[in-house]
Amino acid sequence: MKRSFSRVAIVNRGEAALRFIHAALELNREGERLHTIALYTEPDRHAAFVRQADEAFELGPATVEGPDGRRKIAYLDLARLERALRQTRAEAAWPGWGFVAEQPAFADLCERLGVTFIGPSAAAMSALGDKIAAKRLAEGLGIPIVPWAGAPAANESEAERQALQIDFPVVIKASSGTGGRGLREAE
């Protein structure tokens, strides 16, 4: 498949960004041309991923105040990301993992700007962001899954009833969220 972009904004930091930069360098050694653009916040201005990228664009402070008055990570500020993508003339955006990689609104923003989002579609993120809907989808497709209660537990006593039905040990997980945060084993 022919790639239709050469300027890629890296919308992540640290190890994730470095991994992408090193992969791009490897491609470039093979005769490809992938221009890396590190999007970074003030505290990372001297970080290795910023120095090693072909180009770097500062997003500003690491956290910003959201419309609700609460602080949020700058990588989740869509207005800043839109400005960065436009000003750097990015043709693609690679979010890596975490941060904005799990935000369907960022995939939608990229589509609106004509920037290739390197990751799942916003629809796929929305569908799989809800773990209960994702398990039901997998079951419907005949994909083997770990035994489960088939529905969320509304309260502690219902969770206990479901656990007895499945048998111990069980794993308790929030229906949304990623990365195993909130994952608990009960015996």
Give a label for each model feature:
Residues 1-187:
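N-terminal beta-alpha lobe that positions the nucleotide/phosphoryl donor
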